[in-house]
Amino acid sequence: VAVDNRVDLFPESQSMVIDANWTVRNTHATPIQDVHVSMGDDKQLVAVDLGGQTLSMHDADLGYRIYRLQKPLQPGETRSVHFRAVQKPNGITAGQAPSNIVDNGTFFNSRVLPSFGYNEGAEISDRNERRKRDLGEPRRMPKLEDEAARANTYIANDADWLDFRTTICTAPDQVALAPGYLLKETTVNGRRCFSYAMDRPMLNFYAYLSARWEVRRAKYKNIPVEVYFDPAHGYNVDRMIEAVQKSLTYYEANFTPYQHRQVRIIEFPGYARFAQSFANTIPYSEAIGFIADLRDPDKVDYVFYVTAHEIAHQWWAHQVI
């Protein structure tokens, strides 16, 4: 129900340390004795504190752990938990090396942190293989009338909307961003630290970015619209701002008022080719808009439609899901 993360980012060495401090609540009718924890890269999860626990199962290949609580979490009870995750270069691997922490243009989201609950995504899905192992038939999609299943979305399972606060520290020549509103900026040991908080509950889905950007600012009504971009990639920034303004005009007229006090579009390098909408904050790859050639009027203006699509997620996901 609450997140307060401390992120220490070191772009120059492609490394970071995250101390995740969360408040969790048992919303079920029975005590919780065992806690299932999934981690995308198991070796990055270096510390776990669930208020007293023992590790009863650990599958490092799947990044899956089961902890038994020394004191079960009672119905309605809240508890503070802590995780520490460390990411750093680890030589050359058989797969693709992590590329989201870079010298200029870091972007990663909350999926680098642990998640709670049984992970159906790790189940064997092949029907023949399941029969060989006597695992029964694969789970079917829930019925539309199953209200309990509505707590599970493509973003998170059985997760409440939460209060979000965070501090991110980065190199002295960079700006670090996260969803929410800037509370303060400080300098600690020569590094720039930015503290953010969201003023209303939000999904358990957030991002962190750090780079040396130029910023172009405009407004929609009294709402600041900001685009953070590489100084060499300013070609389509005005078109993005126009797309934000026109999208907000249409969505407010046909849906509901925009729920936040700012809109930020933030460029990240072409190591990924997508944009992703978080609460009031939209990371946006250089490869799908910032360096697009829009001079031919007969070609589809995908800068406009990608921007409009991401703004729409501020309603469809970040209000209704």
Name what the model sees in each region:
Residues 7-15, 155-157:
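Short, solvent-exposed beta-strand/turn "edge" segments of beta-rich domains on protein surfaces
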Residues 20-24, 77-91, 164-172, 194-201:
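Short, hydrophobic/aromatic-enriched beta-strand segments in well-ordered soluble domains
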Residues 21-41:
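Ligand-binding face of N-terminal immunoglobulin V-set domains in extracellular IgSF glycoproteins
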Residues 31-32, 42-104, 152-156, 189:
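A surface-exposed beta-strand-loop module
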Residues 86-160:
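Glycine/proline-rich low-complexity spacer/linker segments in large multi-domain proteins
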Residues 138-308:
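Hydrophobic helix-coil surface modules that form long, contiguous segments used
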Residues 311-321:
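Catalytic Zn2+-binding segment of zinc metalloproteases
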